[in-house]
């Protein structure tokens, strides 16, 4: 009964379809006036919630890594080591913030900030439920694809500003990798947009709703959809520098890549940006191909499972669950697949993924035109 009551809540943290609509409805003013401050104030707790969740992504990775290696992982601080990450944050806050003497201090300082901002700006267009979205853009999918480019600037600033050859090598590798893999990733997402007929991420999600649950998801609407789905997942691993594409921070070659010289909270901010990007690409994959906030459970005869597990609160649960599932897969692959060489990385992008992405795009267009 309580679960059904929660699913009927229509006024969660945000009223309306976006923070903009919420602030305007609350005050009666235009978004260009006073409500803009309300939007910022409303976004602050969301950022802290995201930081809290991503912080425990580090704990999750350590536990998963330990499980893969038949270890226990963090166990000392708190029950099952659940407070270990908080202890690490306190430790990093007390660490000395070292800036190399020969570094470009401006670039060295702003690099992690640009990375962090670029990672979290994408959260603005992620529809967490029908009433929980920061900005409902009609080109939200393009925004999510393009915002990754900001991280390239931060990586270059961090690598060049460090005045360290290993940092610069790592930055150049990372930029080449991200820019290259944006092409197959973008084409794969356009296949999903073609199936929905819109670039609005909220509309893409709403078009995948229905009483049959997962059967309405884009991934199961066409046999061709599996191709762009797999291409985007592989390309997204490269975009966020996860194994087997973690060449920019290969420990045996580059120490720690473009953040070799960083310490203290700057080091922590770079890691938070990485985990933020991991969730972002996982959420985009879930929205475009797996229904986003929609429940995957179908109705079973007289039991309306889909209706019982739908609504704003359930929507947040479903999209976060789907996102964290793909984060788990990313962590799993880290201890399963060996690291690729640079030439293998580029070969996979330009001679395998990109041609297949174009093939998937053409086949999706043909399917949408000729198959009712």
Curated annotation (Swiss-Prot):
One Pfam family matching this protein: NADHdh
Membrane topology according to the record: Multi-pass membrane protein
Keywords: Cell inner membrane, Cell membrane, Membrane, NAD, Quinone, Translocase, Transmembrane, Transmembrane helix, Ubiquinone
Catalytic activity: a quinone + NADH + 5 H(+)(in) = a quinol + NAD(+) + 4 H(+)(out)
Subcellular compartments: Cell inner membrane
PROSITE patterns: COMPLEX1_ND1_1 (PS00667), COMPLEX1_ND1_2 (PS00668)
Enzyme Commission number(s): 7.1.1.-
TM region positions: 31-51, 106-126, 139-159, 178-198, 217-237, 269-289, 313-333, 352-372
Any single GO BP term: aerobic respiration
Keyword Translocase annotated: yes
GO MF annotations in UniProt: NADH dehydrogenase activity; oxidoreductase activity, acting on NAD(P)H, quinone or similar compound as acceptor; quinone binding
GO cellular component: plasma membrane
Main location: membrane
Recorded superkingdom: Bacteria
Known function: NDH-1 shuttles electrons from NADH, via FMN and iron-sulfur (Fe-S) centers, to quinones in the respiratory chain. The immediate electron acceptor for the enzyme in this species is believed to be ubiquinone. Couples the redox reaction to proton translocation (for every two electrons transferred, four hydrogen ions are translocated across the cytoplasmic membrane), and thus conserves the redox energy in a proton gradient. This subunit may bind ubiquinone.
UniProt record similarity statement: Belongs to the complex I subunit 1 family.
Known partners and oligomeric status: NDH-1 is composed of 14 different subunits. Subunits NuoA, H, J, K, L, M, N constitute the membrane sector of the complex.
Protein name: NADH-quinone oxidoreductase subunit H
Species for this entry: Chlorobium phaeobacteroides (strain DSM 266 / SMG 266 / 2430)
Gene name tied to this protein: nuoH
